[in-house]
Amino acid sequence: MKTSKIVLFFLLHILFFYSLPFALNTVSSKRIEGEALVRWKKTLSSHDFLDSWALNNTMNLRSWTGIVCNSEGSISEINLSLSLNGTLDKLDFASFSNLTRLNLNNNNFYGFIPYQISDLKNLTYLDLSYNHFTGEIPESLFTNLGKLEYLTLTGNYFQGTLQSILTKLTRLKGIVLAQNNFSGSIPDIFGSMPNLEILGLTSFQGNIPASIGKLRNLRLLDLTINSPLNFTIPPELGLCTNLTYLALSGNSLTGSLPLSMTNLTKLSTLAITDSNLSGQILSCFITSWTQLTALRILKNSFTGEIPSEIGLLINLTTLILNGNRFSGYIPQEIGSLKNLWFLDLSVNLFSGKIPPTIWNLTEVIIMDISSNHLTGTISPEAGDLMSLRLLEVLDIGNNDISGSFPFWMESLQKLRVLVLKSNRFNGTIPISKVKLSFSNLRIIDISYNEFTGVLPNEFLENFKAMMNENDNDIEASYADVLSTISLKGFEYDLRTFRRHYTSIDLSNNKFQGDIPISIGKIKGLHTLHLANNNFTGHIPSLENLTSLESLDLRSNQLVGEIPWQLTKLTSLSFLNLSYNHLVGRIPERGQLLTFPNSSYIGNPELCGLPLTTMCGNGEPQPKLPVSTTRRDDDLNSLDGFTWQVVLVGYGCGMLFGLVVGYLIFKYEKPEWFIAFVYQIYRIKNGRRWR
């Protein structure tokens, strides 16, 4: 018994002395890592988010912001997306011998990548995207980081040739180098990159190498081509049968889709934008791509009809085909896409009536079928209103649709944007019998139609969402719904406007009677266009419209003086009161002093600057006649206010969340690819454009 105790005591001592160096080494390692981070923190100009980085807390690095530790307590990951400012020059990479992941995306780091980054021998993941790094990628990054698998450098100012980069990254599984200043063509080396799963390159020259077909493990491919020559999609692309995400853009792409793409049966997202591709979308493509959740083929030259097999894509959430030359009827089978929430068929050559099945898309949030040759009417019988309970944006402008104002839409409680412009709608707008008619509407454009009669006060009083000038309570699904304004020859992108932008455009109709006084209650209104109607009476009081930026009342039958209260509208940047019957002196205060002569011409009894007609004792000048010819010329030169509701952005629809943006969806961006990569590898990535 005594002997056993002695043996046990002896073994415990051996274990203690054996483990002591390891424990001391762990403590020392934590202190070294912590001190290195604190030293680097002091060189950053904005580090309020890093208050937890303190020398008195090096034994608990897990509590530090952006730090992940392994089981021994040593730092294994650094994840910082905090808009930090500074460089990497003072970061002692050699202190982090166990670091496997370095994610510094979405900051404001600048300068070169230090060659000492090669000291991170165990690094498998490096993300420096969306910063301001410059220069060439250091040679040591390629030669010394033998365990590196994923490299993301998107959105910087790196230089150099793709040849020198890709030939040294053959062991990687993921490479994303989009939005930089790299030059040269893609080298024909894909045969030596058998493990590649993710490839994202933009702004390269030359063609897509046929050797891309050797990337049998490739799952995500995003390529943008900028070349003076024209190239076709290589048929070898069809050999990449594991592709789930394919994005191709660039005006150098020509020809048609190769039939070999029918082999890409795992595709969930296909985006082909801003190219010169032509031909038809054949039925065999649709029947092969039954896993699609997002199909975005926009701004190309595709022709022909949409195959009826489109109804087989039951997983589809996003269908964007705008900016092509598709023709024929809109297939009624689209009504079978019960998961569809984004539909954009605008700017094509579709004809015939709108299929009634389209109103049965129960999940649709954004619907844009504008700028086609659609005819017929839309009426309550077109579908079950409850099916459209989620609809927020509807644009059927620039077609040939007729009938009365679609008051059946007033029950759509989530409707925010309604564009009916440039059709043949007619008749009067009656007083609504619904208590909350269009209560959430923020943008309405019914210009260039044939509406007549007196505009009811109650019609405008229903626009409750426009009433509050400080209303920022907008859901994310609408916050990025954007439009392009064409205003007097100038294009404005609503990305530069406030997110709670509101607009009423009733111009170029045949409304008559007084302008409803209820217009003065819409305090949150930014744009009011009533031009080219037959409104009579005085200009109503608009002094409460303190957010108003654009007011167009030209070419009506308005009388009386210009209300002095208009001088209180300090946000007003556009005004047109021309070709009415206004009289008296133009108020010489505030914003009214900034507008040109063209804002007031065609009112013979107006006087004062900027007109040449003097007031009071001044010498009168010849008055301009209000001729029909002059009025028509003015209408042609001043096109008024037009809307084109378009797609922006946001991941691939419900693949990535709520609606982030109408414009983002219409125009393909490499960020779609990056966002998808981030989703797969669980990277927190907030968008930042440069």
Task: Put a short name on every predicted segment.
Residues 1-690:
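Plant-biased, solvent-exposed loop and capping regions
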